[in-house]
Design a protein with these regions (language model features):
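Catalytic-core regions of core metabolic enzymes
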Residues: 1-297
Length: 297
């Protein structure tokens, strides 16, 4: 789920307006886009890449490490299952509001496969200086800068804001992982945290969470075991109960998934929790200052 230069990307829905725009941005940024999928335009070329009738057909002609889904909710299930059948390793699903029954059917199909779903409703993956997949502004050097801080976020906009604050403070990113804001997703905060813990380029991790669900609490238990420092910002401190705030998964119901419980779990695990995104950058600067002092002694 960490994008690396040279991984090949198939864009399902490449000929649509959004698919075209973002595929061009990905290519400009260095992402290796090897083809697109549109059953009605198979055999054509679009923005310089070949169009296939399906992901399975594409996999017969070229290596497909990652697929990105620019497909409407009602059709997303078939596109994702096509990518699973093609043996694609990582399927980045940008589509929001994929029907829950469809998501459960997709997860059942994943069993026994080598595929992983990132999303639904993810903004994508970014590795500054190497490329990006999805709809994050990975091409914007004011937002993303190569470095050693891994960032995990359920929200694309909050993830962008966090990376902007980090970059302005001089803290570059080793990877950005957008896990998605829908209630049922294929890659959790814990999954992403474990991946960044294993990543040799990452020396610190920022977890951008939000109200709803219990993913941050589960990630906190793992963070307790990590040697790398973990910091967090949780959005939704003032959100009223039983009201969806932005994402379908961002809702506090029956006293579960609230801001206070998430913050308490993270702090018990030794995670430093910020009140604002800008404060995270200050925490990282404190660590860098202490390390320089220790090195000089």
């Amino acid at each position: 789920m960490i994008y690396r230069r040279g991984q090949t990307v198939l864009v399902q829905g490449i000929t649509g307006k959004q698919g075209t725009f973002w595929a061009e941005k990905m290519i400009e940024c260095g992402t290796t886009v090897i083809g697109g999928v549109n059953p009605k335009r198979a055999g054509e070329t679009h923005i310089g890449v070949p169009i296939y009738g399906s992901a399975v057909e594409a996999a017969r002609h070229t290596r497909c490490d990652v697929s990105v889904i620019f497909i409407p909710p009602a059709l997303a299930k078939d596109a994702i299952i096509d990518a699973i059948d093609a043996g694609v390793g990582t399927i980045v699903t940008l589509t929001e509001h994929v029907p829950s029954h469809d998501v459960l059917e997709i997860f059942a199909r994943l069993k026994g496969s080598n595929s992983r779903i990132v999303g639904p409703n993810t903004a994508g993956l970014v590795t500054p200086g190497e490329g990006f997949i999805g709809i994050m502004p990975g091409h914007n050097t004011n937002v993303f800068k190569p470095g050693s801080v891994g960032v995990i976020s359920r929200s694309g906009s909050l993830g962008t804001l966090m990376c902007l604050n980090l970059t302005r403070a001089g803290h570059g990113q080793s990877a950005f992982i957008g896990i998605g804001g829908d209630p049922i997703i294929g890659t959790t905060s814990l999954d992403a945290l474990m991946a960044l813990d294993r990543d040799e380029r990452t020396t610190a991790v920022v977890l951008v969470g939000e109200i709803g669900g219990s993913m941050e609490e589960a990630a906190a238990e793992y963070a307790r075991t990590m040697r790398k420092p973990v910091f967090s910002f949780i959005a939704g401190r003032s959100s009223p109960p039983d009201k969806k705030m932005g994402h379908a998964g961002a809702i506090v119901s029956g006293g579960r998934g609230g801001y206070a419980s998430k913050r308490a779990a993270l702090e018990r695990a030794g995670v430093r929790v910020a009140d604002t995104p800008a404060e995270i950058a200050a925490f990282l600067s404190e660590i860098n200052t202490r390390e320089r002092v220790f090195a000089a002694e």
